[in-house]
Structures are given as C-alpha cells and as structure tokens.
Swiss-Prot record:
Protein's cellular compartments: Cytoplasm
HAMAP family referenced in this protein's UniProt entry, alphabetically: Glu_tRNA_synth_type1
PANTHER family, sorted: GLUTAMATE--TRNA LIGASE, GLUTAMATE--TRNA LIGASE, MITOCHONDRIAL-RELATED
Binding site for ATP: K234
Assembly, per entry: Monomer.
GO annotation terms (biological process): glutamyl-tRNA aminoacylation
InterPro entries referenced in this protein's UniProt entry, alphabetically: aa-tRNA-synth_I_cd-bd, aa-tRNA-synth_I_codon-bd_sub2, aa-tRNA-synth_I_CS, aa_tRNA-synth_I_cd-bd_sf, Glu-tRNA-ligase_bac/mito, Glu-tRNA-synth_I_codon-bd_sub1, Glu/Gln-tRNA-synth, Glu/Gln-tRNA-synth_Ib_cat-dom
Catalyses which reaction(s): tRNA(Glu) + L-glutamate + ATP = L-glutamyl-tRNA(Glu) + AMP + diphosphate
Originating species: Thermotoga sp. (strain RQ2)
E.C. designation(s): 6.1.1.17
Protein name (record): Glutamate--tRNA ligase 1
Length: 464
C-alpha cells in the first residue's frame, strides 16, 4: 500500500513550499488509494512549540489536506510526535552500537566541542561526571546510490562524508536518524520532499542499509523560488499559508496555484484539486525551480472567485471576515447576493471584495480623498447632486436601463461633462471612484438607499 507522510517542524507558520509538498503527497495518496500520514518533527526543543503545531494543523485543514494518521487522531504506528518517541530512537541507536555501526563519543566537560575518546561501551563513569556523550554513525567506504523518481540515478561517494551524530548529548536524535526510524516503523513507501533534503539522503540510506531495512522510494522536488531565483523566504515577502488566508486567498485557489508551480497540467490552468486528482502523476513534476508570482496567485484567485457558485462565495466571504475580525452586518439575503455578484467582477481577493462591498454593507462609508478633491469641490457639484436626487425621486421604474437613461439625460443638461456627472454620483452613493458599473451599482443599492446617500453627500458638501 502507498503510505506517504508530511512531516513539518513546528517552528513557525506553514510555508507555501511545505504546503505544496503536502499537496503532492496528499494527491498521490488519494489517487493511489493509500494513506497520508502527518508526523510532527519537534525535536528542536528550543524552537518548536505546540502553538505552531496547532497553526500548521489548522492551515492544512483549511487547505483541504486531511490526514489518515497523525498526532490529533492517532493511528496504528504512533506516537506521531518525535518528542514522544525518544525511547524508540535510543533503543535503535543502541542496536547500531551493538552491531558496531555506531559508537559513543565522549567530550571534554569544559570544552564540549573537543572529543576525548570513542568507545563501543556505554561510558557510564564519564556520563555521571557530566561529560557530554553522543552517538556517531560510522560511515563505511564505498558509494551510496539510489534512483530518484524525478532526478533519476543519483550516486554519492562515501568518502565525502564524515561519521555523523545520530544521538545528541541531550538524548534527542538528530534529524537524519529519527526520520529513518520513523519512516521505517510507520511503513512509509514513498518520500516526496524538497530538494534541499537531497544532501541528507545518502546519510539516511546508510542508516537503512545498517539496519538491513528497505528504503522508501525518494523524490526530491525543486524548490519554490523568489524573483531573484533564490529559495523563497521572508525577505521576498509573505510566504506563509496563514498570510494568504488572511489576505483573502481562497484555499482552492492557493492549492490550484501551488499545483501549477512545477506540475505540468494539461488543459485549463484554473481547476480544483479534485478535478485533476486522477490525472496526477509525480513524474509530471518539473525538475526545475519555479518562481512564486504573487500577481499570478491573485489572478488565479480572482478566477476562482468568479467561477464558484455565489452561495459558495458568500459562505467563503463570511467565514473569512469572521476569521480576520471584520464585521459583516445582517442584510437582506437577495440584496447581499446581488451586491456580491456585481462586486466580485472587480476584485481578486476577499480582502479587496470587503473593501468594494463596504458601501453596500454600511451607510457609514467615508469619501475617498480623490473624490472630494477632484469632484466634490467643483462648483457644479451641488447642482449635479440636487438634479440627480430630483430625477431619481421621479423615477418610477428602478432598473439599469432607466437609471442609465436618467444619468445620460442629466449629463446632457450641460451642468458638467459626462465623466464629472458620473463620478460625482458614483462617489456620492459609495464614497469611491472605482466601483462595479455605476448603473448596476445604483440598481442594486435601490431607490431609497440611493436617495438617502445623495442627501447625505449634499449635507457633507455643505459642511465642507
């Protein structure tokens, strides 16, 4: 059976690179009818925290990447936190020493970087006197090779590696040792991970060989890069799933975009993961690094916002607003839906949607500075607004065609140019100069709300 794992370290928020790795593992497991395991690698006691662990789990859930075994739900091969598996690592390290494939190293008390001697016998006396003791793995002469699913045949000369620590003096395992023990005991069949782990692979394969265990199939995925073609990091800007969630990126759009980063997809590049799941083949992943393009992500998100059902968008919008602490007032359902329908055409994120929707959700909007300076302060502004109020008041049929005719008739009276008339009205009823189409905006706002807002703007004008 296919068994893959995603094994983050809880030292920060989930990075988009980690999310993409999790996605590729998840897709492979789901397509093959296998298991997706979540393991927490928290042996870095100084930097790891349960708070970050919970945030990572929450980000994965939001991404729609559910797991079959993990720290929160258990499973047949737990525990699923490395910090809860210390005795397991110690026992297996001891076995390597017994087989003379590893040995103890005793260090100077005053200078812990200075090795005093090595031994196959546990140095009780020195340990009791406070000497640091580690266990090192013995690198044998020869070559280590494996077939990478993406990169093909890989070979390493063992002479380039020195004996390396597998158990630290604090009793915790090093990464390369713990990951081998865990992957073997959890029966992991495939390891898909970033190519930054490629240099770890020969060490891990040596440990597999020393135990006489079969190694999993490895695939090392090229990293996500910043615009300068260096690995994507905080210096390039936001890199966490949490950030993009708060910015108003839909989870389906983020997964869509991350899948596009390296996976050669046939057909339309706007899709849900479920739509492309059966066509996923890890061998279709590119062997070249890919640049993370924030603008492309927003574009993909905008496509999804206009692609999904309005009710789904409404639910996503309300959930997002609650998550980031933005208020959405209780509004008439059909009015809210219509406002959402016209506003989603102009924006690419839920955050932008909130800003453009605000005048539809609240009468207490502010007037943009440009609107006040460029239009409201014009000497003809008051007359245009008064005439518009009168014309709308007399309007019997409140629809887009009649609203357009009314405004065009008004602009032909010679009070101001058509642009000035339209922008004066637009800003009066929304406070903004960029909105959905003016005629449909006024239609959705309705007659009563439009008249009140024209009057509100006239009062504001008189005060300034």
């Amino acid at each position: 059976m296919v068994r893959v794992r995603f094994a983050p370290s809880p030292t920060g928020h989930l990075h988009v690179g980690g999310a993409r790795t999790a996605l590729f593992n998840w897709m492979f497991a789901r397509k093959e009818g296998g298991k997706f395991i979540l393991r927490i690698e928290d042996t870095d006691t100084e930097r790891s925290s349960r708070e970050y662990e919970q945030q990572i789990l929450e980000s994965l859930r939001w991404c729609g990447l559910d797991w079959d075994e993990g720290p929160d739900i258990g499973g047949d091969f737990g525990p699923y936190r490395q910090s809860e598996r210390l005795e397991i690592y110690r026992e297996y390290a001891k076995k390597l020493v017994e087989d003379k494939r590893a040995y103890y190293v005793v260090y100077d008390k005053e200078d812990p970087s200075k090795e005093l001697f090595t031994t196959y016998d546990y140095p009780h006396e020195y340990k009791e006197k406070g000497h640091p003791v580690t266990i090192k793995f013995k690198v044998l002469p020869g070559k280590t090779s494996f077939e990478d699913l993406l990169k093909g045949y890989m070979e390493f000369d063992n002479s380039t590696l020195e004996d390396f620590i597998i158990m630290k003096s604090n009793g915790f395992p090093t990464y390369n040792f713990a990951v081998v023990v865990d992957d073997h005991l959890m029966r992991i069949s495939h390891v898909f991970r970033g190519e930054d782990h490629l240099s770890n692979t020969p060490k891990q394969l040596m440990i597999y060989e020393a135990f006489g265990w079969e190694a999993p199939v490895f695939m090392h995925i090229p990293l996500i890069l910043g615009p300068d073609r260096t690995p994507l990091s905080k210096r390039h800007g936001a890199t966490s799933v949490e950030h993009f969630r708060r910015e108003g990126i839909l989870s389906r759009a983020l997964m869509n975009y991350l899948a596009l980063l390296g996976w050669r997809v046939e057909g339309d590049e706007i899709f849900t993961i479920e739509e492309k799941l059966q066509s996923f083949d890890p061998k279709d992943i590119s062997n070249k690094g890919v640049i993370f393009d924030y603008q492309k992500l927003e574009w993909v998100n905008g496509k999804h916002m206009r692609r999904i059902d309005l009710e789904d968008l409404k639910r996503e919008f309300i959930e997002w607003a609650k998550y980031v602490g933005r208020e959405i007032p209780s509004l008439n359902e059909s009015y809210f839906t219509e406002a959402l329908r016209i506003c989603r055409e102009k924006v690419n994120t839920l955050s932008q949607l909130y800003d453009i929707m605000y005048p539809f959700m609240s009468d207490d909007y502010e007037y943009e500075k440009d609107y006040v300076e460029k239009f409201l302060k014009r000497e003809e502004a008051e007359r245009v607004l008064e005439e518009a109020k009168k014309a709308f008041k007399d309007l019997n049929s409140w629809n887009m065609e009649e609203i357009e005719k009314t405004l065009r008739d008004l602009s032909e009276k010679g009070l101001a140019s058509k642009k000035v008339v339209f922008q004066l009205i637009r800003g009066a009823v929304t406070g903004k100069l960029v909105t959905p189409g003016l005629f449909e905006t006024i239609e959705v706002l309705g007659k009563e709300r439009t008249l009140k807002r024209l009057e509100r703007t006239l009062q504001f004008l008189k005060k300034t």
